[in-house]
Amino acid sequence: MKQLKLVLCLAALGNMLTGPFLGSSYSAVRLSMPFAVIDTTNCAPNSPTVWFAASNGDDGNDGKTPQTPMSVYGATHTALPGHRICFMGGTYAETGTFYPPRSGTPSAWIVYQAYGDGPVNVVWTPTTLACPPAGTADCTMVNAVPSSGNSYLEFRGFTFYGQGLAGDAFGCNNSHHLRFIGNTVYNVQGAGVGAVQCDYLVSDHNIVYHSGYSGTTASWTSGISYNQIKAFDCNDGLHNVISNNIAVGQYDNSPYHSDGSGFILDMNATPSACAGTAAPYEPAALVSNNVAYGNGGRCAEAFQVSFFWMMANNTCYINNLDNVNANQANTGSLSTNAANNGYFADNISVSWQASNPPYDQRNTNTNIQYFANLAWGGPCWVDPDGSDFCANNPQFIKADPRFAAAPYFDPTAAGQYAPAAPPFLLANGLTPQPVSPVYCQGVDPTTLPGVPAQVAADMQNAGNAYYIYKDFKGKARPGAGGCWDLGAYQH
């Protein structure tokens, strides 16, 4: 989203004070979506740090067991730093934005998670809230803002149904240290995760499907968007991560038709200063192991960012489907636009049409490096002359990746982002076959020349294995014999 947007209205403030969830379950949702497999061992009954919540919970209960859950309001306002709120399976009707009531601390995060007995379906059902396009209320489903709980929070295993009316599923505005893990987002106006001037974010193993169709500026974003990243501190290591997510059917139906991508690092027009200095400091970001197909916009883009960033082991298949508008007609899949200091390593990018480059560089970019990528479906493109920088470049394999059962897209039909096959039907469709040219062609991206030492060390940290050293499904990378495959799946 190419603008800073933070709208807090009195109607939303009322939700902060009374809670945005109805006390009874809403009617059944219409689309069967997957839910994350949740480790319930952390939801131990009768623990002093665990609270249970349910759509029909009662604050007269003690909230200490699955049989005695509190309401969402009661449990979330009772939890303290270091506590965990475990949500029982069910459907939760959300009538307005949920603002976490308090922050955790660096050593004691607050965790919101599905208990694991069934999907936790959060369904946007506002009654009087004036959401776009009719109004300008903050219609984000969960929003971390400085006026309430905004840091050291984790959200895990929820399914959000935006009904085409909610803004973003998760919002972050001038906040820091947030984790969004294993969530599913369907049919919001904006992003699955939409962050503006935030830092230390992790978005991992989420699904964002069929969002951005509202026709308002709320749609001027992408599946997961980190906008104007603002440094919380001057640590030289890895700050922000987008990993192991699936984005499908994203669409920018705003008047601009410039976004609708799977993932974006978007604008650092206001770089932060290191504490005690006037020098701008821009924290490092990683986009890895993601899958994007059937989107109206790009697979992933770095737009006007100049901090160190890397896109590694992503699988991009048939994106750029919103070709009606001039802003999208010839854009690339893995794209830089007025960006600097970026690495592309071990990616697979397959174009829909030859006019949509698998990789492109728009406007003036500097220090963009490529290592062991596959490009297929069309020539690459660099401004101003449109030359194919992938041709005759040993860092690119120009071949069909030979996927097992890739989703079908018509080679010319418009609007195919809307009916793109949902991710729970994908199965192993974008895993390479044994004859694929991507087997054993990759490199360990942490060892590439010029990667900042502390960033490499953070990516190599065993606690961060899912970012680099495990594939999308958790298989160890490298595989047998030191084999490192391209794309999100290791054979």
Identify the residue ranges that each predicted region occupies.
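Right-handed parallel beta-helix/beta-spiral solenoid domain characteristic of secreted/periplasmic
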Residues: 55, 86-95, 103-168, 398-401, ...
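Predominantly extracellular beta-rich ligand-binding scaffolds that present long acidic/polar faces
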Residues: 95-101, 107, 247, 275, ...
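Acidic Gly/Asp/Thr-rich repetitive segments characteristic of extracellular carbohydrate-active
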Residues: 44-45, 53-99, 436, 473, ...
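Enriched but not universal
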Residues: 1-41, 490
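Extracellular beta-strand/beta-solenoid scaffold signature
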Residues: 95-100, 126-145, 164-172, 187-196, ...
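C-terminal accessory segments
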Residues: 394-491
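Feature marks extracellular polysaccharide-active and adherence modules
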Residues: 88, 113-115, 156, 161, ...
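All-beta strand scaffolds that present successive hydrophobic residues in beta-strands
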Residues: 87, 112, 150-155, 178-180, ...
